[in-house]
From Swiss-Prot:
It comes from Campylobacter concisus (strain 13826). GO terms for cellular component: cytoplasm. Catalyzes the conversion of 3-deoxy-D-arabino-heptulosonate 7-phosphate (DAHP) to dehydroquinate (DHQ). Belongs to the sugar phosphate cyclases superfamily. Dehydroquinate synthase family. The lineage of its organism: Bacteria, Pseudomonadati, Campylobacterota, Epsilonproteobacteria, Campylobacterales. Coiled coil: none annotated. GO terms for molecular function: 3-dehydroquinate synthase activity; metal ion binding; nucleotide binding. This is 3-dehydroquinate synthase. Zn(2+) binds at residues 175, 233, 250. It is an enzyme of class 4 (lyase). Its EC number is 4.2.3.4.
Length: 345
C-alpha cells in the first residue's frame, strides 16, 4: 500500500509505503542509524532486502535522554570518517527519537543529504516519521534545536510492531488518539470499540498516516493548521522536562497533556464535562496515564514560555473544543491555567 504526501515544493513530496520494504533500493553509501535494541530485532530484515552500493551501521544510545547535540556530533563524525558525500543516504531504523535525530543529522551534513524513515514503533509509524520535523532536546526544553526536513520516503512494516513492549505500544496509541480527537470523530468512535488485531492495526496506521499527510500537505511548516497536532504537547513537554525524560515515554506524557488540555477546555466552557470524561476513559482503555502530580503550578506555568509555540508573552494552547475539533487559544487567562494545574496537585 502507498500513501502520497504531496507538498507545494514538488521535489519534497514523497511516498509512504506500508508493508513494501522490499522496494528499498538506493545508490551510493548508506548509513543505517539505529540502536542496539532495535538492531537486534529488525536490522537483519532490513539488510536482507536493502539494495545499495555500500552500507554502514551507525549505532546510537537508546533513550530520549540521548536525543541531544552530543549524539548528533557522534553521528556526523561517523559520516565524515566514512567519507559520506551529498549522494549518500541515511536510514532511520527505530522509533521517534531515531527518526528525529537522523533527519536532523541529514539536514545539516554538508548542508543536506537524503534520508529515509523506517519506523519500528507505533508512535513513529503513525506520527513522528511523517511530516519532516527533526531535532533534538537541550536543557531549555524539547525539540528546541531542529529543522523541517522531509524524508525521501517512509517504509512502515506492520510486523515490526509485534515486537513492541505493551507500554511502547500504548505510547503510540496516544498519538493516534490525538489525531482522532482533533480531526476525526469517526476514527475516535472506531478506536473506542475496536479490537486491534493485525488487520485493524494496519487500518490504524493507514488512517493515522492519511490524516497526518493531509494536514502536512496544507501546512508543512506549522504556520496554522498543523499546530493543532501539538494538542497535549504543550503540557507534555513540561512534564518530560521536569522528569528529565526518564519517568514517562513521550506518548505517555502526551496522554497526560491531553487530559490536562481537556480540563482547561472544560474550565473555559468549550468542551463538555461528558466528552472530557469520554476521552479520559479511552486513554485509560489503552493503558495510558492521565495524571501527573504537579508540585509547583507557578513553575509549571513559567515553563510554558520555553515552548516553541509561545509567541512573546502569549502561550498558544491547543485545545479540543469537542471530539473531532480543536482550536488554538492565545488569550487564556493565567489564573484559568493555574486553576487547571491545581486540579493535578
Amino acid at each position: 500500500m502507498q500513501i502520497n504526501l504531496n507538498l507545494k515544493e514538488k521535489a519534497s513530496s514523497y511516498k509512504i509505503y506500508i508493508n513494501e520494504l522490499e522496494r528499498l533500493e538506493l545508490k551510493g553509501k548508506v548509513g543505517i542509524v539505529t540502536n542496539a535494541k532495535v538492531a537486534g530485532l529488525h536490522l537483519e530484515k532490513l539488510l536482507s532486502v536493502l539494495k545499495c552500493d555500500e552500507k554502514f551501521i551507525i549505532s546510537v544510545p537508546d533513550g530520549e535522554e540521548y536525543k541531544n547535540l552530543t549524539t548528533i556530533e557522534q553521528i556526523l563524525e561517523q559520516l565524515f570518517v566514512s567519507k559520506f558525500d551529498r549522494s549518500s543516504t541515511l536510514i532511520a531504523l527505530g522509533g521517534g527519537v531515531i527518526s528525529d535525530m537522523t533527519g536532523f543529522a541529514a539536514s545539516i551534513y554538508e548542508r543536506g543529504i537524503s534520508f529515509i524513515n523506517i519506523p519500528t514503533t507505533l508512535l513513529a509509524q503513525v506520527d513522528a516519521s511523517v511530516g519532516g520535523k527533526t531535532g533534538v532536546n537541550n536543557k531549555f526544553g524539547k525539540n528546541l534545536i531542529g529543522s523541517f526536513y522531509q524524508p525521501k520516503a517512509v517504509f512502515c512494516e506492520i510486523n515490526f510492531l509485534k515486537t513492541l513492549p505493551k507500554r511502547e505500544f500504548a505510547a503510540g496509541m496516544a498519538e493516534a488518539l490525538k489525531m482522532a480527537i482533533t480531526f476525526d470523530k469517526e476514527m475516535f468512535s472506531w478506536l473506542k470499540s475496536v479490537n486491534l488485531d493485525d488487520e485493524n492495526l494496519a487500518k490504524l496506521v493507514e488512517k493515522s498516516i492519511n490524516l497526518k499527510a493531509r494536514v502536512v500537505e496544507q501546512d508543512e511548516k506549522e504556520k496554522g493548521l498543523r499546530a493543532i497536532l501539538n494538542y497535549g504537547h504543550t503540557f507534555a513537554h513540561v512534564i518530560e522536562n521536569e522528569t528529565n525524560y526518564k519517568e514517562f515515554l513521550h506518548g505517555e506524557a502526551v496522554a497526560i497533556g491531553m487530559n490536562m488540555a481537556n480540563r482547561l477546555s472544560v474550565r473555559l466552557g468549550l468542551m463538555s464535562e461528558a466528552q472530557a470524561e469520554e476521552i479520559k476513559q479511552v486513554l485509560v482503555k489503552f493503558d495510558l496515564p492521565v495524571s501527573y502530580k504537579i508540585e509547583n503550578e507557578y513553575a509549571f506555568y513559567e515553563a510554558f514560555f520555553m515552548d516553541k509555540k509561545t509567541k512573546g508573552d502569549k502561550i498558544n494552547f491547543i485545545i479540543a473544543d469537542k471530539i473531532g475539533s480543536a482550536v488554538i487559544k492565545n488569550d487564556v487567562k493565567k489564573e484559568d491555567v493555574l486553576e487547571t494545574l491545581r486540579e493535578f496537585k
